[in-house]
Amino acid sequence: EKTSQRGLSRLSAGRAATLLLMVVVVFAVLAQQVRRHGFPERLPEEVARIEAVHADKHPRSRDCLDEGDDCLFGQGPMRAILIGDSHADHLLAGLLENIPEGQGSVLFRGMAACLITFDARFNQEGGERCDQMSQWLKENHRGLPAGVPLILAGAYSRYTNNSEISDSEVLFYFDERVRTFSAEYFQTFRERYVAMVCELASERPVYQVRATPILNQDV
């Protein structure tokens, strides 16, 4: 500190002011670079926000996912029915935030890695739980409170191979004879899914959440 003071004392007032201004400019430029690009090896601010949203879930939403039971969240009359897989699970907190406290509740029923579709049969070990979930909705949807909106959400692109024709074996099927991602398979799926939504919509408004993008690797 004393060495710096001795050096500065030899400068004229003009040169000292110029030096101080240069230091301020350098720090200002560096601050702008950090603000725009962040520190090396640190997640960009946009990615950090996405990560925070990923964890923004209702603390009890996992209690009902995969348990095969329906859960009522909130207080008051039922305002919405949420059905789907773990992607639907992530919507629960947002739905509840848009209902004034104490003035409504959300019925949630979900099953991870399951596309809810009437009469579908999952083509993998453990798929019975998915079949049972679809069957439950088919048999019980008319008994749910009339007029309450139904929201369907899920990782549709994963279940349907991004709608691309392929010789790969399907995750679920409707016909034993059609078990690859063929044009016939997609036509059958389209017809069955639309028929299901129309049947559900005969009792209440039905909302289909756009498919959630899935990253192929962690970031």
Predicted segments with their positions:
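Extracellular/periplasmic envelope-modification machinery, especially enzymes
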Residues: 2-219
